[in-house]
Regions:
Chain B
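STAS-like cytosolic regulatory interaction modules
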Residues: 1-72, 84-135
Length: 168, 135
């Protein structure tokens, strides 16, 4: 093992694809999140590994709970280096599904105080235990990710970006 | 130390989360260990919540520690059940509440205070945090 160099500048990339979604029978979100947590733990501080873990679990859970095109593919891509952590999760979606997600992203992206948005939403929805969007809100409020959603060739593509300033 | 009650989440035949309520003299200790990632945690923890509602009012408690240090992850599906457990403590026993958490953990430092409802003055006034290094 090399003792030289700055380990928190290590470039790591991973791409995982699973198709069809319908064949998934277990906790795929947890498996992928924990795998990436352990892999990044070789190079990066625990706090960064936890961010990757949380974003993969929340975004993949969203896919497994809401994706209606079950014969399509789930794609998870991770890229990290000294500058940024970028995680992309893609799944097949109808234009209507993309529109619904996109509206939610707009609300989250426009929030002046993401933490207050998360808190207000949790308290408001607690009565009927409604979920819808809490996972996305926590990624901006808690983990400080910048989220974007795009529609590319029939796929909903969600990108979560965390600038590594102060960590690398 | 007397165990008052406990709750557990099983996933794929394995225990993935458990919470135990213990009494050490007049000190109530609630531990939270593992991960909450299942779709419907109430399916596993509703009995625990019912038991807490029954046993806590019968105890003589002067202080409480809620220990989250070994709770590595809680996805958004688990937010409400954590709120219900901590509510049981704040509503059913008196005294100060110490919350043990990991110092540099995003979910424990950013979201957990929301779930504790620290925006309520009477809860904030009873609560202090003990930040520890990750185990």
């Amino acid at each position: 093992m090399s003792a030289g160099g700055n380990r928190t500048q290590t470039a790591v990339g991973a791409s995982i694809s699973i198709a069809p979604l319908d064949h998934v029978a277990g906790d795929v979100a947890g498996l992928l999140g924990n795998f990436l947590f352990d892999l990044l733990g070789m190079f990066y501080p625990r706090q960064i590994c936890s961010k990757a873990n949380v974003v993969v679990i929340e975004l993949v859970t969203n896919v497994m709970e809401h994706c209606s095109i079950r014969d399509g593919a789930l794609r998870v891509d991770l890229k990290i280096d000294g500058d940024e952590l970028m995680i992309t999760v893609a799944n097949p979606a109808t234009e209507d599904e993309f529109k619904a997600v996109s509206d939610r992203f707009t609300i989250i992206a426009n929030a002046e105080d993401p933490r207050k948005l998360l808190a207000d939403t949790v308290y408001r929805r607690r009565i009927d235990k409604a979920k819808g969007g809490l996972g996305l809100m926590r990624l901006t409020a808690e983990s400080k990710f910048k989220l974007t959603a795009e529609y590319e060739q029939g796929f909903l593509v969600v990108k979560a970006l965390f600038p590594m300033r102060g960590f690398a | 130390m007397k165990v008052l009650t406990y709750g557990e989440i099983m996933d794929g035949g394995l225990s993935v989360f458990h919470s135990v309520a213990k009494l050490d003299d007049h000190h109530l200790i609630l531990t939270f260990e593992g991960v909450i990632r299942v779709d419907n945690p109430y399916r596993y923890l509703h009995t625990y919540l019912e038991e807490l509602a029954k046993v806590l009012p019968r105890q003589s408690v002067t202080e409480t520690t809620m220990d989250f240090v070994k709770m590595r992850f809680c996805n958004s599906n688990g937010f409400y059940v954590i709120m219900d457990i901590v509510d049981a403590v704040y509503n059913l026993v008196p005294g100060r509440v110490t919350v043990r958490r990991i110092a540099d953990d995003d979910w424990q430092c950013e979201t957990l205070p929301i779930l504790l409802n620290l925006s309520e003055e009477h809860i904030a006034a009873r609560t202090n945090f003990e930040d520890v290094k990750a185990p």
